[in-house]
Amino acid sequence: MSCNCGSGCSCGSDCKCGKMYPDLTEQGSAAAQVAAVVVLGVAPENKAGQFEVAAGQSGEGCSCGDNCKCNPCNC
């Protein structure tokens, strides 16, 4: 399950909870501006009802937990 707490959440210079994929960072140097291809796998079909459970989460606030993950994931 992915958690995106929004751009307003950060904890420290190395951890930004608002990043959807924190491992994929932008590089500023000219050598690093090489085109990259990211191949995403195939996921099984979602069953009806799974989305509703995830969409039911609500609330404000976020804090960074272990390994720079949003904690809790209820943003």
From Swiss-Prot:
Segments crossing the lipid bilayer: none
InterPro entries documented for this protein: Metalthion_15p
Gene induction: By aluminum.
Any coiled-coil regions, as ranges: none
GO molecular function: metal ion binding
Keyword Metal-binding: yes
Keywords linked to the UniProt accession: Metal-binding, Metal-thiolate cluster
Job of this protein: Metallothioneins have a high content of cysteine residues that bind various heavy metals.
Membership in a protein family: Belongs to the metallothionein superfamily. Type 15 family.
Name recorded for this polypeptide: Metallothionein-like protein 1
Native species: Triticum aestivum (Wheat)
